[in-house]
Amino acid sequence: MQAINIIHSRFVPLQMENVDTDQIIPARFLKATTRDGFGKNLFRDWRYENDDESNPKAGFVLNDNNFTGSILVAAKNFGCGSSREHAAWAIDDYGFKAVVSSFFADIFKNNALNNGLLPVTVSEDFLQKIFQQ
């Protein structure tokens, strides 16, 4: 795990509230016990039609080349649901170094910190200003 000093990056906006860990990384992909390889299945059910990698869903932010970066900006209550550490692994393995939101589920926030992913909490007002950019 490397220390984060400064991140120079564009942000990727995910304007969905109450994103739970099963949406971040679906349970059917949790067979591995090492943290490598989970990024390809990040938001899998939102990214692909019929679970087919050759058929990306139009309009989903991770499928849009205009939105690339190492900072994920998510709506409030990000990482709710179960306590799976795999959610932080998948976000990190995809290439995100930080997640910005107005509220994180406590277990997700701790898992992120313990695994080198930086959760940044901002006010809801500030978060909405980011989304408007």
What annotation goes with each model-predicted range?
Residues 65-96:
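Glycine/serine-rich anion-binding loops at beta->alpha junctions
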Residues 10-12, 22, 69-72, 97-99, ...:
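Structural motif
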Residues 105-121:
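Active-site-proximal loop->helix
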